[in-house]
Amino acid sequence: MSVAILTSLPPQWLSILAVFLLPILTLLLFRGKDDNQKKGLKLPPGPRQLPLIGNLHQLGGQPYVDFWKMAKKYGPVMYLQLGRCPTVVLSSTETSKELMKDRDVECCSRPLSVGPGQLSYNFLDVAFSPYSDYWREMRKLFIFELLSMRRVQTFWYAREEQMDKMIEILDGAYPNPVNLTEKVFNMMDGIIGTIAFGRTTYAQQEFRDGFVKVLAATMDMLDNFHAENFFPVVGRFIDSLTGALAKRQRTFTDVDRYFEKVIEQHLDPNRPKPETEDIVDVLIGLMKDESTSFKITKDHVKAILMNVFVGGIDTSAVTITWAFSELLKNPKLMKKAQEEVRRAVGPNKRRVEGKEVEKIKYIDCIVKETFRKHPPVPLLVPHFSMKHCKIGGYDILPGTTIYVNAWAMGKDPTIWENPEEYNPDRFMNSEVDFRGSDFELVPFGAGRRICPGLAMGTTAVKYILSNLLYGWDYEMPRGKKFEDFPLIEEGGLTVHNKQDIMVIPKKHKWD
């Protein structure tokens, strides 16, 4: 979704807004600037601002690219005024480390954004909730009850079931092409849906198809670039004119209806007891538990389910498809990746088992390189400063929204040799990891706000990639060449390849 919200309004509305609001907001903007100068603060450098909109006019449909271009001129700590929101963008390893390690205490909150706020039932979740005692307790429950390594292992049945379906599709496809992008997204949806709602519910195709459409609409809501976020007073009016407000309400109502239906099904005393508890079962157990530090309601359950689906499907699926796209475009690299997987696992197996994935060291390199060049969320979920602090020698005031441009960090030539080249081998003898201690690579963030679903997400990514590389060799449809496969970034909160992967899978023949 474009950040340049005002361009979506008819010219006559812009004129009306300017006449009524320009004098007031101009006074506020310049008074704020004068106050900072009087205090002797050293704010980060940044581009000049316009009255009323600040720097919004300089951002388009790919804000992470716009931020990267501006940072080349203004540096790795850059200040922008997005409407009424003071904003800082960090674009280097050093500054991201300062934010998420050295200044984590002061800057680990979240801005109160309208889309995430509504979808999280007024910030009852873990991903978007501001820092507080409530958030700390909820995060403990979330990790211990739902995302611990013990729980991740429990959910292997869902991954294996969905992989068996994928194997059946790919084995029977030749000589016809398959839309692998679509199949990967369907597989991730099937895994997360089964883990969250259970086999019985997610096996209902009509329910699943409808829910998938609703989930796709929620991704637009989670984009922070809505007018109401930048203009607290008149932004809601602007969103109502553009239709964004009605769309947000419609999407929330739709997804809430699905969550309510699933919870009621799980509360039915006549429901057959499943072999393995799904996430809704676990959360309902917590609802009934009187010993928790706070009372868990249906809204808490729904907010956590939203985190599970939004964080579990798109980010994993785009990582898998980007990795496969890069390998497909480079046949020599694809051959090496397949040989490494097959050598580690051995011949003539129906599928790569979960316990075998850890033996495939080259898969780790592929995943890391994909996170570097194609972080699934190019602009990490924004931080929000609670106290005055300094980053990169500049003053960061309370109430500042702070973005980490993970995409820009992956293109830094001072850190990465030939950053435009996709080269998993760069990680062969490297200790750099993505679990929050190495700030060269932070696709999941770091510090208090590191993504709690890291283990579950990377487990699925490595498992699916290993199997796709192990079982089949791939041909391009007639008239297409591997080298000509386009890599075009598209999206909002998450960024995927605009071009779907259309390939002809051919079962690998062992010597």
UniProtKB/Swiss-Prot annotation:
Top-level taxon of origin: Eukaryota
Transmembrane segments: 10-30, 304-324
Cofactor(s) needed for function: heme
Keywords: Endoplasmic reticulum, Heme, Iron, Membrane, Metal-binding, Microsome, Monooxygenase, Oxidoreductase, Transmembrane, Transmembrane helix
CC annotations in GO: endoplasmic reticulum; membrane
Residues annotated for heme binding in this entry: C451
Principal localisation: membrane
EC number: 1.14.14.41
Tissue: Expressed in storage roots, primary roots, petioles and vascular tissues. Expressed in the outer cortex cells, the endodermis and around the xylem, phloem cells and laticifers.
Annotated membrane topology: Multi-pass membrane protein
Keyword Nucleotide-binding attributed: no
One GO molecular-function entry: oxidoreductase activity, acting on paired donors, with incorporation or reduction of molecular oxygen
InterPro entries linked: Cyt_P450, Cyt_P450_CS, Cyt_P450_E_grp-I, Cyt_P450_sf
Reaction it catalyzes: (1E,2S)-2-methylbutanal oxime + reduced [NADPH--hemoprotein reductase] + O2 = 2-hydroxy-2-methylbutanenitrile + oxidized [NADPH--hemoprotein reductase] + 2 H2O + H(+); (E)-2-methylpropanal oxime + reduced [NADPH--hemoprotein reductase] + O2 = 2-hydroxy-2-methylpropanenitrile + oxidized [NADPH--hemoprotein reductase] + 2 H2O + H(+)
SUPFAM superfamilies registered for this protein in UniProt: Cytochrome P450
Enzyme class label: oxidoreductase
Job of this protein: Catalyzes the conversion of (E)-2-methylpropanal oxime (valox) to 2-hydroxy-2-methylpropanenitrile (acetone cyanohydrin) and of (E)-2-methylbutanal oxime (ilox) to 2-hydroxy-2-methylbutyronitrile. The reaction takes place in three steps. First, the oxime is isomerized to the (Z)- isomer, next the (Z)-isomer is dehydrated to the corresponding nitrile, followed by a C-hydroxylation of the nitrile. Can use both aliphatic and aromatic oximes as substrates.
Family: Belongs to the cytochrome P450 family.
The protein's name: 2-methylbutanal oxime monooxygenase
Organism this protein belongs to: Manihot esculenta (Cassava)
